[in-house]
A protein has these predicted regions:
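Core segments of cupin and vicinal oxygen chelate
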Residues: 8-56
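Hydrophobic pocket/interface hotspot
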Residues: 17, 21, 84, 91
Length: 138
């Protein structure tokens, strides 16, 4: 079986969150979606399960983190700097926040961080591995 990751995120408005994630480039998998949850596909190995609070409670009784706090930031590699900028623009246009952290311009890597409507953090980045500076072994 292929190794996959399913990131489970509690959301306050499932329809708003579905529209938000579609705008970022995720596709909805209807086979694993209903009126309490939606499976949003980033790639063959990466999925975001957006869950109503009631559905989330079927998995855990742990409290929801307050908006504006974070325990993880999920980062997605994109094909270009323009794609990074487009993802942040889409986040802003669909109820999220763009540039929640300072933009990073490192020459070989460009990143901008965003938040979904519930405050979950996502990093969008582009990197040119051939341009990564290498330490002098001597």
């Amino acid at each position: 079986m292929t190794k996959m990751i399913f990131v489970n995120l509690p959301v306050t408005d499932l329809k708003t969150s579905i529209a938000f994630y579609k705008a970022l480039g995720f596709e909805q998998n209807p086979q694993f979606s209903d009126d309490t949850a939606a499976c949003m596909v980033w790639s063959e190995a990466i999925y975001a399960m957006i869950l109503t609070h009631a559905k989330w409670r079927t998995f855990t009784d742990r409290p929801f983190p307050p908006a504006g706090t974070s325990e993880v930031m999920l980062s997605l590699a994109l094909d270009s700097r323009d794609a990074v900028d487009a993802m942040n623009a889409a986040a802003l246009a669909h109820g999220g926040q763009a540039d929640v952290n300072p933009v990073q311009e490192l020459g070989f890597m460009y990143s901008r961080d965003l938040a979904d409507p519930d405050g979950h953090l996502w990093g969008a980045f582009w990197m040119d591995p051939a341009a990564i500076p290498h330490a002098d072994p001597g």
